[in-house]
Amino acid sequence: MNRIASYLRTYATEAERPMATDVQPSESDVERLLRQRNVGISAHIDSGKTTLTERVLYYTGRIKDIHEVRGRDEVGAKMDSMELEREKGITIQSAATYCNWKATPPTERSNMTGDAADESTVTTQKKHDYHINIIDTPGHVDFTIEVERALRVLDGAVLVLCAVSGVQSQTMTVDRQMRRYSVPRLSFINKMDRAGANPWRVVEQIRTKLRMPAAAMQVPIGAEDNFQGLVDLVRWKAVYNEGTKGNVVRESDDIPADVLELAREKRQELIEQLSDVDDEMAEIFIEEREPTIEELVAALRRATVACRFSPVFLGTAIKNKGVQALLDGMCAYLPNPMEVRAIANDTAVAKKIAAQANEEGHDVAAMQSSAQHGSEVQLVPATEAPLVGLAFKLEESRFGQLTYMRVYQGILRRGGIIFNSRTGKKVKVPRLVRMHADDMEDVQEIGPGEICAMFGVECSSGDTFTDGSTTLSMSAMFVPEPVISLSLTPEGKDTSVNFSRALNRFQKEDPTFRVHVDSESSETIISGMGELHLDIYVERMRREYNVPCTTGKPRVAFRETISQPAKFNYTHKKQTGGAGQFGRVIGYIEPMTVDEDTGKDTAFVNSVMGGNIPPSYIPACEKGFADGLEKGALAGYPVCGVRMVLEDGAAHSVDSSELAFRIAAHAAFREAFRAANPTILEPKMSVEVIAPVEFQGTVIGALNQRKGTIEDTEVREDDFTITAEVSLNDMFGFSSQLRGLTQGKGEFSMEYKKHEPVMPNVQADMEAAYKKSLEKK
């Protein structure tokens, strides 16, 4: 009760921003939220995320038996519910579930004892019941949006790493995503039973490659295929999983002699690492005093919740070892929903700030930034507060559209009326469910801090829902731009309806899946994050909609941009008898980097003073700018990284119109674009290759042949890892080449890194080819 009272006293006083409501969490809110965790499990592909989640569900009693990925037992892992996921052995869509866990507090000193023949988890004198919402995310970079939107709504995460491979390319992507949303994380080094497992190398990689202070919470007893158990460095006990499925957890005060010295060394290392990021632990370290278990646990929790430290747990999910300790760690060190500061924008306040700034003649970009930050409020996880929830994922089910929702404050009720803050529309919630992969459980209401799903609510991913009493809106998630495209043609007759239906559904579900019709060839073009990403959607179209398709050759997502500012002063004048067309625009364009608040790298800024261009024509000028972004002047690729600033102009009382100013702005943009030293950009990929060490020279030669730049090489006893930067345009066909070079033993992954200018000779060829294609028309 003292802890509850403490939360009630300090919740409002610790707020960094104005509170969204005067209502505070009640005692029952605090009591419930203290025992709740919202956790995502993320990692590089094949690190064992889904296998780990399967064990978590089994040990918490959520499922009755353990099944493996790839459907080896003709059942498949619970969280891989799609047929394609079970066939390919990869997670394609993030899957949500929930479970309850009786956690042993790290400060609990009593031993666990039990009969190994008893297949139930052994109890202790004191345990606490925790409710855990879990989202299992894909590891393949092509499905990175699934990780993005999961981390947007979660309070904590488990970053799974392979004990052999360590930090890999997608690990670094997930790390960036966790930092983007300030998500505290535990690290779990999986596959400790594999040959070549080296947890200390992986811990060092977390510190150096991910730049995250970290230390092991455990020391392994035995190595590789002789991996037997773990030494808990906080509670100073030897821990063993026994029973056929690791259900029985046995603890002992006797630390094996062969690991005793290492355990002492690693415990001291844990304290030293913590003292670098926690002031209270630093004082204890300076005093050369041994911290108590309570002091150590408190410091671990403070540093983890503040995203300054990552506790590292060890285990092997496939061999059922170390999972229960990780569950205890989730409950002990990851934040509850009250410890995460959820921020929303009050749109009414934002409009007032923007209007005031406009009246005072401030720069438009500064005005927008001021309105964004000045309207921020902190949401309160109280049931009595006005409802605020975020729709973070859409999915089509046999019952209609399924909308996943995180409730931040207030209560969402079945049959209740909610308002979409983006559209202003009100909708009724016909059905409310908790998800367990593809199964669901109907509920009547969901409180703050919970994750649920709604049926029959039309919306878009990233929409905010309220009860209509507030003008709050939460920021949407970051959506990366597609890097690859291909043409798609449905086979057979009478497939056009299902073809359109499938494309519309896939676009609603996945913001990184884009569709457009090529204006020149009239082909349907789909764009996405990689070849596998698009292949999955083509296959889903065949299976789910009975629409087999023919695909064209993949196309790289080239872009055009500028490298210096350029002014424009353009007049569009046309007289054809009667009312003509007149519009004059003056201003400049300049290079622009990605805006951290909006995630966009193009912007139109209205700096017109004095009304030389009537305000009613400004939106038409912005549309003209948008028209210019669609096709660059060099090779017809979309334009990025440009800000257009409109400073002045002129209008005619009779001949001016929206169309005239739209044409004028478009022509002015194209004219200035040519004068701004434009260049063509191509996507550069971070490529990671793992293969047996005897093929190292051959693989490096293949990457050099594709004009790759080797960035890092790590050689182990049996295999090696090479990281290189290669143009996506040079990576087609590498998969089959690598199989041939390594006798099928090599594997690679790649992820988008950045867009960079193409070589001058390549740009000249692309410009010539584009000019030639225009001449043929």
From Swiss-Prot:
Keyword Cytoplasm: no
Domain tr-type G: 34-338
Transmembrane segments: none
Record-level GO BP terms: mitochondrial translational elongation
Residues binding GTP, per UniProt: 43-50, 136-140, 190-193
Pathway(s) it belongs to: Protein biosynthesis; polypeptide chain elongation
Main location as per UniProt: mitochondrion
Subcellular location: Mitochondrion
One of the record's GO molecular function terms: GTPase activity
Keywords: Elongation factor, GTP-binding, Mitochondrion, Nucleotide-binding, Protein biosynthesis
Family: Belongs to the TRAFAC class translation factor GTPase superfamily. Classic translation factor GTPase family. EF-G/EF-2 subfamily.
NCBIfam families, per the entry: EF-G (TIGR00484), small_GTP (TIGR00231)
Name this polypeptide is given: Elongation factor G, mitochondrial
Source taxonomy: Eukaryota, Fungi, Dikarya, Basidiomycota, Ustilaginomycotina
Gene it is expressed from: MEF1
